[in-house]
């Protein structure tokens, strides 16, 4: 059993890493999907209310609320798969929740890219929530407020996403294929 979590600032490549995992047949739990479902359950448009509902869930149920809501989904995936990727961890409390639940079978991967590159990627992609008018600075500040920097500091592995898309895909595939969950992967695959 392996549970691989990704952490990183907006536009770093977390969703792209999840796509690589999904293409390899690995179940992916997108923590943002938990929030989007909560928006719908509250009769709100996820594209317009994602950030506010993410904060509301944490205010109402504690800083680990989204991770706790994710655990049964992950455990369900693990009945049929040996590896699950959790996309989009936002706080050290969420990291602790997953480490408590899965112990040494949990690996946290920091997907890293410089701010200007991330900003350009966000501007180029067409994803709900990216165009809701929230500037990148505000979004980063909100995520830092959740404990993003502390979560990043807890990462077991870092993948630097500054090269080509193919190189990044190779790095993610190397991590997914590693014999041990905490195997360091090279930052560059030239």
From Swiss-Prot:
Q: Provide the transmembrane region boundaries.
A: none
- Gene3D superfamilies reported in the protein's UniProt record: P-loop containing nucleotide triphosphate hydrolases
Enumerate the residue ranges of region (Disordered).
120-144
- Supply the source organism's classification: Archaea, Methanobacteriati, Methanobacteriota, Stenosarchaea group, Halobacteria
Any one Pfam family here would be AAA_17
Q: Report the GO molecular function annotations.
A: ATP binding
Q: Which organism is it from?
A: Halobacterium salinarum (strain ATCC 700922 / JCM 11081 / NRC-1)
The record, for InterPro entries, names: NTP_hydrolase-rel, P-loop_NTPase
Give UniProt keywords alphabetically: ATP-binding, Nucleotide-binding
Protein's UniProt name? UPF0200 protein VNG_2452C
Protein family membership: Belongs to the UPF0200 family.
Q: Which residues bind ATP?
A: 8-15
């Amino acid at each position: 059993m392996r549970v691989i979590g990704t952490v990183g600032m907006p536009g770093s490549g977390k969703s792209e890493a999840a796509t690589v995992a999904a293409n390899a047949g690995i179940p992916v739990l997108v923590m943002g999907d938990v929030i989007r479902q909560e928006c719908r359950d509250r009769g709100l448009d996820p594209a317009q209310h994602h950030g506010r509902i993410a904060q509301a869930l944490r205010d109402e149920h504690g800083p680990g609320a989204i991770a706790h809501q994710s655990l049964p989904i992950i455990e369900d995936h693990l009945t049929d798969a040996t590896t699950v990727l959790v996309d989009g961890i936002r706080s050290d409390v969420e990291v602790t929740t997953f480490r408590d639940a899965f112990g040494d079978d949990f690996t946290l991967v920091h997907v890293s890219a410089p701010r200007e590159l991330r900003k350009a990627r966000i501007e180029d992609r067409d994803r709900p929530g990216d165009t809701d008018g929230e500037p990148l600075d505000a979004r980063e500040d909100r995520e830092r407020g959740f404990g993003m920097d502390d979560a990043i500091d807890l990462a077991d592995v870092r993948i630097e996403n500054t090269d080509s898309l193919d190189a990044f895909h190779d790095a993610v595939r190397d991590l997914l294929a590693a014999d041990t969950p905490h195997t360091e992967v090279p930052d560059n695959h030239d």
